[in-house]
Amino acid sequence: MAARLQEFYKEKVVPKLIEQFGYKSVMEVPRITKITLNMGLGEAINDKKIIENAVGDLTKIAGQKPVVTKAKKAIAGFKIRQGYPIGAMVTLRGERMFEFLDRFVTVALPRVRDFRGVSGRSFDGRGNYNIGVKEQIIFPEIEYDKIDALRGLNISITTTAKNDEEAKALLGAFKFPFRN
């Protein structure tokens, strides 16, 4: 069974974008290819449990086991050696991606304190969107009593859109709450 947003994309979003931008083929319509969740954990150089807890949190949020990212180069100023674990990331595609996007837009974003919408300026010029989340507790899968620290994460939404205008229209069609 396809995810709810996947059906919504095929039935509602594609015709709307074809009408708005005048695409000749259905394959021209921009689509979301992947969503990457990244958690940078610079403080993990002192305590290995931080990495384990962050991996557990990301697993609950994404429904998929993340990869522990390691330092590419040694940086003496940050007391980091090459190969030290300094973060965790997970890439979502297909059905899991649509299910995460659905939960993120309908459940997690409204739980952010003082939420007035996401910035419409976080596009990179090539149709990809980045959003930073300050606390992982906005996701309902994370139990507030069982976390050791509040950690933020970066969410990158990669699309096939050629420019920011097309990408904003695509995410707007998915009911993304842009503030401007």
UniProtKB/Swiss-Prot annotation:
Keywords: Ribonucleoprotein, Ribosomal protein, RNA-binding, rRNA-binding, tRNA-binding
GO biological process, one term: translation
Keyword tRNA-binding: yes
GO molecular-function term, one example from the UniProt record: rRNA binding
GO cellular component, one term: ribosome
Residues spanning the signal sequence: none
Keyword RNA-binding applies: yes
Top-level taxon in the UniProt lineage: Bacteria
Role noted for this protein: This is one of the proteins that bind and probably mediate the attachment of the 5S RNA into the large ribosomal subunit, where it forms part of the central protuberance. In the 70S ribosome it contacts protein S13 of the 30S subunit (bridge B1b), connecting the 2 subunits; this bridge is implicated in subunit movement. Contacts the P site tRNA; the 5S rRNA and some of its associated proteins might help stabilize positioning of ribosome-bound tRNAs.
Family note: Belongs to the universal ribosomal protein uL5 family.
Subunit structure as annotated in this protein's UniProt entry: Part of the 50S ribosomal subunit; part of the 5S rRNA/L5/L18/L25 subcomplex. Contacts the 5S rRNA and the P site tRNA. Forms a bridge to the 30S subunit in the 70S ribosome.
HAMAP family linked: Ribosomal_uL5_B (MF_01333_B)
UniProt protein name: Large ribosomal subunit protein uL5
Species the sequence originates in: Cupriavidus pinatubonensis (strain JMP 134 / LMG 1197)
